[in-house]
Amino acid sequence: MSSSFFKKRLSPIKPGDPIDYKDVDLLKKFITDRGKILPRRLTGLTSKQQRDLTNAVKRARIIALLPFVNPEG
């Protein structure tokens, strides 16, 4: 079995850049077509960036900037 089952993506976020919950275009890059947050091994983010991203996505969902689930998939 090949070890490159998952394709690792290069992060569009630089280490010092803040992740803003109002930046919906950036957040959509880290969400699947069904609305799930991509894991860190696929996004290439640091652990702190992944935590900040998760909080930003959850906050954006609560204030209806992002859907909780995308049924169209």
Swiss-Prot record:
The keyword RNA-binding applies. One of its GO terms (biological process) is translation. One of its GO terms (cellular component) is cytosolic small ribosomal subunit. GO terms for molecular function: small ribosomal subunit rRNA binding; structural constituent of ribosome. Gene3D superfamilies: Ribosomal protein S18 (4.10.640.10). Keywords: Ribonucleoprotein, Ribosomal protein, RNA-binding, rRNA-binding. Pfam families: Ribosomal_S18 (PF01084). InterPro entries: Ribosomal_bS18 (IPR001648), Ribosomal_bS18_CS (IPR018275), Ribosomal_bS18_sf (IPR036870). Belongs to the bacterial ribosomal protein bS18 family. Part of the 30S ribosomal subunit. Forms a tight heterodimer with protein bS6. Binds as a heterodimer with protein bS6 to the central domain of the 16S rRNA, where it helps stabilize the platform of the 30S subunit. HAMAP family: Ribosomal_bS18. NCBIfam families: S18 (TIGR00165). This is Small ribosomal subunit protein bS18. It comes from Prochlorococcus marinus (strain MIT 9313). The lineage of its organism: Bacteria, Bacillati, Cyanobacteriota, Cyanophyceae, Synechococcales.
